[in-house]
Amino acid sequence: LSSAASDVYKRQGTGSVSVEMALQCGSGRVYAVDRNPEAVSLTDKNKHIFKCDNIEIIGGNAMDNIEKLPVPDRVFIGGSGGELQQIIKMVFKKNRKAVIVVTAVSLETLNKSLEGFRICGAETEIVQVSITRTKSVGEYTMLCGENPVFIIKGTIL
């Protein structure tokens, strides 16, 4: 997600992406929505550690809060509580020009995001990233792969 000073963000998670976006967008606002009270607390802690006064943290379900938030320019979805397609539809309903980025660690979430973008007429770009660690096994160094993460970007042209 590239950012500009006027961009508005909506985010679900534990704070790392919210903080990064807040630092990038300068005078823009970041709205961090999470239904997990522990994640809300961690996001608030990181907001203060990194001096990000432009983050507004909202506890609760994304679907219950999207309508109340300003029209977003960029949206990051790191978890959806099973409502991924509905969230995608709702964001594009508010702003057809929004850029939505979803992270997925399962094929089912990848599929649901692609289907949600397809239903809305959005173009998609997918990047898959994975981490590989090494482990010493005798005189050999073995590569041990971690779970891959899919990053799906949806835009309506």
Model-derived regions: residue spans:
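Conserved SAM-binding motif I beta-strand of class I
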Residues: 29-34
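Core SAM-dependent methyltransferase catalytic element
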Residues: 140-157
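Short SAM/SAH-binding signature in class I
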Residues: 71-79
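Conserved Rossmann-like nucleotide-cofactor binding loop
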Residues: 13, 38, 108
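S-adenosyl-L-methionine
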Residues: 35-69
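Single conserved hydrophobic/aromatic residue that forms the stacking wall/gate
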Residues: 1-5, 9
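C-terminal substrate-binding/active-site "lid" region of AdoMet-derived donor-dependent transferases
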Residues: 92-145
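Conserved SAM-binding loop of SAM-dependent methyltransferases across substrates and taxa
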Residues: 14-26
